[in-house]
Amino acid sequence: MQKIVVYVYIYLFVQISVDPVALDGSSQPTENTEKDGLCNACTWRQNTKSSRIEAIKIQILSKLRLEQAPNISRDVIKQLLPKAPPLQELIDQYDVQRDDSSDGSLEDDDYHATTETIITMPTESDFLVQMEGKPKCCFFKFSSKIQYNKVVKAQLWIYLRQVQKPTTVFVQILRLIKPMKDGTRYTGIRSLKLDMNPGNGIWQSIDVKTVLQNWLKQPESNLGIEIKAFDENGRDLAVTFPGPGEDGLNPFLEVRVTDTPKRSRRDFGLDCDEHSTESRCCRYPLTVDFEAFGWDWIIAPKRYKANYCSGECEFVFLQKYPHTHLVHQANPRGSAGPCCTPTKMSPINMLYFNGKEQIIYGKIPAMVVDRCGCS
C-alpha cells in the first residue's frame, strides 16, 4: 500500500511539473513559458552567486584556520605594512587575481592554505634582554608549524636612513645569547660594508637562513638580534624603532618555505556570460571584492575572479540514470540526482594579516572554479 501511495505521488508531481494547472482547474497559458523560463534561470543564477560569495567567505576563514576575520583597522595596517621591495612586488603582482584557468591545470592536494612566504614583524620578547642599559631590536616569534628543514630562504630586511653625501656604512647583525662567563652577550651573524649615495634611504637584505633554522631547532636559543649600521662619523642609520614619518620602515624577516606537491587535472566544460540563454550546466563569471566585505586584513588581492556553476543536468544522464533524469525533468532545481558543480578548481595566492598581526603570503587551494560539470 505504501509503495502505491509513493508511485501516485511521483506521478502527480511529474504531471503538475510538466503540465501546470491553475487553482480553478484550467490550464495555465503557455505563450510566455520560454520567457518565464529565462527569468527563472536569471533568478536561480543570482541566488547561486549570493550563495557562492557567502561560501567563499566561510571557506577562506576555514582554510586559513581562522575562527573569525582578524580585526585590524586600516590605520594599524598603514603602520604595520612594510614599505619594502619584496612586499611591494607581491602587492603589485597580486593586486587583482586573474582567471588563469585557460593556461593552468595544476591543483593543490590539500584543503588548507599552503604557506609560501611569511613576513614576520618584530615583537616584544618573552624575556627582556638588555645591552648597554637599554633594550635592543629585535625579537621575532615563529609559528611551531614552520619546520626548519622546509625553510628555503630567510632574509632580514632593514631600512637605512638617507645620507647627505657619499658614505660608507658598516652593517652588523648580532645574535643575542645568554651571558657567558666572560660577559659576552652576543655573537656575530653577518657583517657587510655598503656604499651609500645621497638621496632617499634604502632597504638592505641580509641572509639569516642558518640562524633561523637553528632557532627553529632550538627555540630557547632565540633571544633576539641587534642591528647596527654606522656611518664613518658613528651615526646609526638603521631604523630599529621607527620615529615620526617612519611608518612601515620596521625591520622584518621574510621567510620562504617549500610548497606542497601538486597534481595535474584536465577537464572540459561550458563557459557562459551573464547574458547567456544557455540552460545546461555552465561556468559563469563572478568577481569577489574583499573591500566590499570590509576585509581590510587581506592585503592582496583586493579582488579575484572566483566564478560559479549554474545550469541543468539532464540528457547526459538519461541512459545511466533514467529515473534521476525523470525527476530532474519534473524538478530541475531539486536536490536529487546529478547537480551542476565544479569539476576543476585552482588556488589563489593571498597576502594577508593573520590574528597575530603577521603578514603571510600563501596559497589557498580550490578557490577558483575553472570548469563545471554534472556529478
Swiss-Prot record:
Provide the leader sequence positions: 1-23
Q: Which residues are glycosylated?
A: N71
Q: Does the keyword Cytoplasm apply?
A: no
Compartments (UniProt record): Secreted
One Pfam family named in its UniProt record = TGF_beta
Query: Which GO BP terms, alphabetically?
Result: muscle cell proliferation; negative regulation of myoblast proliferation; negative regulation of satellite cell differentiation; negative regulation of skeletal muscle satellite cell proliferation
Q: Which GO terms describe its cellular component?
A: extracellular space
Q: What GO molecular-function term can you cite, just one?
A: cytokine activity
Give the superkingdom in one word.
Eukaryota
Whether Transport counts among this entry's keywords is no
The alphabetized UniProt keywords are:
Cleavage on pair of basic residues, Cytokine, Disulfide bond, Glycoprotein, Growth factor, Secreted, Signal
Specify the propeptide location in this chain.
24-266
Disulfide bonds listed in the record: C272-C282, C281-C340, C309-C372, C313-C374
Q: How does it assemble?
A: Homodimer; disulfide-linked.
Give the protein's biological function: Acts specifically as a negative regulator of skeletal muscle growth.
Query: What does the similarity note say?
Result: Belongs to the TGF-beta family.
* Protein name per Swiss-Prot or TrEMBL: Growth/differentiation factor 8
Native organism is: Coturnix coturnix (Common quail)
Q: Which gene encodes it?
A: MSTN
